[in-house]
A protein has these predicted regions:
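Cofactor-cradling patches in redox/metallo enzymes
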Residues: 146-240, 274-291, 295-381
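Iron-sulfur-cluster electron-transfer modules
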Residues: 4, 13, 43-183, 187-218, ...
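Short cysteine clusters
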Residues: 16-22, 26, 61-67, 71, ...
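A broadly conserved sequence feature marking short terminus-proximal activation segments
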Residues: 16-40, 277
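C-terminal amphipathic alpha-helical segment
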Residues: 245, 251-292
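Ferredoxin-type iron-sulfur electron-transfer modules in oxidoreductases and energy-metabolism complexes
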Residues: 1-7, 31-60, 64-65, 74-109, ...
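Short, conserved active-site entrance elements at the starts or edges of catalytic domains
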Residues: 238-248
């Protein structure tokens, strides 16, 4: 079919020479699933639309991009999967999402507008922000919903959000935090719902453009990827500089006055897929950790470009295979001897906390987790 032929061309699927490296690399395939990235490539190359639409395994893919990185033919598997999911969505096929699809429903409500949000309740009196205009826009993402939605996980993702604002205030900046921000639409896009994603993109791009901000900072790796790559077609004027909070802090680390008597703490770091393999950002969070007195970073066996995914980026992969990946990753973190697993994305925290709550593991994989900004904020005088 012409659509599949064009997609195979754009993603270089036609260049696949069936070496099997993608399957050998895939975290899902490695733990015993019969899933293989090649099945989508072969279906696209041969124009098998019915097979693609009827294959629920398309939503098994973590879109972690490990296969992209290892493919000798440079096939863009991740882009191929995202586009094939759009095809499925148009045919009425969607993934089976956990929690009754409640999170997807909230995103779609935001996309349609008219939803009354209370996005500012997390801001304490000690945090200075502007509601509309300023040089720096702090993009909060959906963290204010996560802690309330997943109460059983005892999450503290908002602590990282507060820490980011506190650090900007310490640097003499008063960021814009808008009550009119909406979900970036990352999960809708990656589950195939392009129409609602585009509604969110247009709203959010206009919101930030109207603020006059020259820089947009976010603590969410998925929001970062969405703003840098997926929002690009929606900018009518040159976009603001878009950075992760760890990049922003690394740029200003010399201006942060850290306490000289910092408590000794061994940490390890989880590289988010969207920030690492999707955007190539590895050094900034490590630069921030290296600057904090008393903090010693011990890398996991799989780190940097080879880091293992947290296995649940779009709320559509929550199955026994994802849990096995999460448990394996937490065991790897514990094996470093670290007291704290530092993250740069709230989604990583959520999925790992979920895995830790498995009663069958008896606390075997428990480890404290903190956002990189939270750790830095606690160390600032």
């Amino acid at each position: 079919m012409p659509e599949l032929a064009e997609l195979a061309k754009n993603t270089k699927a036609w260049a696949c020479y069936d070496c099997g490296k993608c399957t050998a690399t895939c975290p899902i395939s490695r733990i015993g699933s019969d899933y293989s990235p090649r099945r989508h490539v072969l279906a696209a190359n041969s124009g098998q639309r019915d097979q693609i639409v009827g294959d629920g395994a398309l939503f098994t893919c973590l879109t972690c991009s490990l296969c992209d990185q290892r493919c000798p033919a440079q096939v863009s598997y991740t882009q191929l999967v995202q586009k094939l999911r759009e095809l499925c969505h148009r045919e009425g096929v969607e993934p089976e999402c956990p929690h009754g699809g409640a999170l997807q429903s909230v995103m779609r409500m935001m996309a349609q507008g008219g939803t009354q949000q209370d996005r500012m309740g997390w801001l304490g009196d000690d945090l200075k922000t502007e509601p509309q205009k300023g040089e720096v826009f702090y993009w909060t993402g959906c963290t204010m919903y996560y802690d309330s939605f997943f109460t059983e996980f005892e999450l503290k993702t908002l602590e990282g959000t507060r820490a980011a604002v506190r650090l900007m205030n310490k640097l003499g900046l008063i960021p814009v935090v808008s009550p009119n921000e909406r979900c970036c639409g990352h999960d809708l896009l990656w589950n195939g719902d392009r129409a609602n994603f585009e509604l969110l993109a247009r709203h959010n791009v206009k919101l930030v453009a109207d603020s006059g901000a020259e820089t947009l900072v976010t603590s969410c790796a998925e929001c970062l990827r969405t703003w840098r790559i997926d929002y690009e077609p929606f900018f009518e004027a040159p976009p603001p500089r878009i950075v992760h909070i760890s990049e922003f802090l690394a740029e200003h680390v010399d201006a942060l006055e850290f306490k000289t008597d910092g408590q000794q703490c061994r940490v390890t770091f989880q590289d988010p897929c969207r920030m690492g393999r999707h955007l190539g950002i590895y050094k900034p969070p490590r630069q921030v950790l290296a600057a904090i007195p008393g903090v010693e970073l011990t890398e996991m066996l799989h780190s940097g470009p080879g880091a293992t995914c947290c296995a649940g980026g779009t709320w559509s992969n929550c199955d026994r295979y994802a849990k096995q990946i999460q448990v394996g990753r937490l065991r790897e973190a514990r094996a470093t001897g670290a007291e704290v697993l530092v993250t740069a994305c709230p989604k990583c925290q959520i999925h790992f906390r979920c895995a830790m709550k498995d009663p069958n593991l008896g606390g075997e994989i428990e480890i404290a987790m903190r956002d990189v900004a939270e750790l830095a904020a606690d160390a600032v005088a």
